Curated annotation (Swiss-Prot):
Native species: Helicobacter pylori (strain J99 / ATCC 700824) (Campylobacter pylori J99)
UniProt lineage: Bacteria, Pseudomonadati, Campylobacterota, Epsilonproteobacteria, Campylobacterales
Catalytic activity: O-succinyl-L-homoserine + L-cysteine = L,L-cystathionine + succinate + H(+)
A single GO cellular-component term on record: cytoplasm
One MF annotation (Gene Ontology) recorded for this entry: cystathionine gamma-lyase activity
Name this polypeptide is given: Cystathionine gamma-synthase
Its EC number(s): 2.5.1.48
Record-linked SUPFAM superfamilies: PLP-dependent transferases
Length: 380
């Protein structure tokens, strides 16, 4: 089954009892049991609920996993992933990892005895050099947030297996429509379902799946024991959003390429970070391991001091956090999504105060170009 079809018919796509083609919202906290210890598959909605289960089956199907897990936010899902590790374990993280993940690791997980080394994961030699005897996991974002670096997933998975490391991939930017890390040899895939999967800026959710039965059993335990499960309304909304993911991603990508090409030629722009451009250093790798380039990219202005005035002059591009909705968003990572990362570390990774990140929506492309044009005119 092709991905466009699987988005609609994958997982559990109808209600087994009534035949309803949209899985209902089972708005219940508990379930009648036939006898002590004998139930119909559900006991309590933290442990399991048919609406959430349908979503979990869907993400597993889309990514090639054995089981999926839905959490109350993307960070709740990442926390569950890192719960696999123990005190004394070491992790490799990307140098432009999402600020929330950086904060989770460096402010919370370090208290549990975990340590990390920050590297450029798109450089395989850096990964090999950074592996220690106590390294247990390699955490990857590809494309990365916000510099859109592309990491070779197959090569990383091979190196990880040589050293008995878990390979964890945040697939939020690419989505299952454009990239399937498990099929390239990795162990765990995480998504911030708030973004492209939901697609309408009305859900907060996290999804995790794995192709390893033993890991799936551990996630099953963590999800129930920690309790950060996704609510039923959000589970239903996310399933509805996923049905149109293919159509939306095609529109996002078409617009993103158009905007990126416009910016690359603009005299006030220094550099555009978009893997869909032939000038991107990992363009060929992105073409090889992805089926599209997503609608996310960043760019730097030649004058960093103009960045704030520029983004505040935009009208269609909404100044705000998040990404992946049908509406276009703009932000300055150094001052917003990545502000929790120390300035020196941000700048060393290339996240300057003048770096602007765009989540290109599905509006008419000409309207987006005109909005950018008028914002540039105001800072000229």
């Amino acid at each position: 089954m092709r991905m466009q079809t699987k988005l609609i018919h994958g997982g559990i796509n109808e209600d087994a009892t009534t035949g309803a083609v949209s899985v209902p919202i089972y708005q219940t906290s508990t379930y009648r049991q036939d006898a002590i210890g004998r139930h119909k598959g559900y006991e309590y909605s933290r442990s399991g609920n048919p609406t959430r289960f349908a979503l979990e089956e869907l993400i597993a199907d889309l990514e090639g996993g054995v089981k999926g897990f839905a959490f109350a936010s993307g960070l709740a899902g990442i926390h569950a992933v890192f719960s696999l590790l123990q005190s004394g374990d070491h992790v490799l993280l990307g140098d432009d990892v999402y600020g929330g993940n950086f904060r989770l690791f460096n402010k919370v997980l370090v208290k549990n005895g975990l340590s990390c080394t920050i590297i450029d994961t798109s450089d395989l030699s850096q990964i090999k050099k950074a592996i220690k005897p106590n390294t247990k996991a390699l955490y990857l974002e590809t494309p990365s947030n916000p510099l859109l670096k592309i990491t070779d997933l197959a090569q990383c998975a091979s190196v990880a297996k040589e050293h008995n490391l878990l390979t964890i991939v945040d697939n939020t930017f690419a989505t299952p429509y454009c990239q399937n890390p498990l099929l390239l040899g990795t162990d765990i895939v995480a998504h911030n379902g708030t973004k492209y999967l939901g697609g309408h800026s009305d859900v907060v959710a996290g999804l995790v799946t794995t192709n390893n039965e033993a890991l799936a059993q551990e996630f099953d335990f963590f999800q129930n024991a920690i309790g950060g499960v996704l609510g039923l309304q959000d589970s239903w909304l996310l399933q509805r959003g996923i049905k149109t993911l293919g159509l939306r991603m095609e529109a996002h990508q078409k617009n993103a390429l158009c905007v990126a090409e416009f910016l690359e030629k603009h005299p006030k722009v220094e550099r555009v970070y978009y893997p869909g451009l032939p000038t991107h250093p990992n363009h060929e790798l992105a073409k090889a391991q992805m089926r599209g380039f997503s609608g996310m990219f960043s760019f730097t202005l030649k004058n960093d001091s103009e960045a704030v005035a520029f983004v505040e002059s935009l009208k269609l591009f909404i100044l705000g956090e998040s990404l992946g909705g049908v509406e276009s968003l703009v932000g300055i990572p150094a001052l917003m999504t990545h502000a929790c990362i120390p300035k020196a570390q941000r700048e060393a990774a290339g996240i300057r105060d003048g770096l602007v990140r765009l989540s290109v929506g599905i509006e008419h492309e000409q309207d987006l170009l005109e909005d950018l044009d008028q914002a540039f005119a105001k800072i000229s």
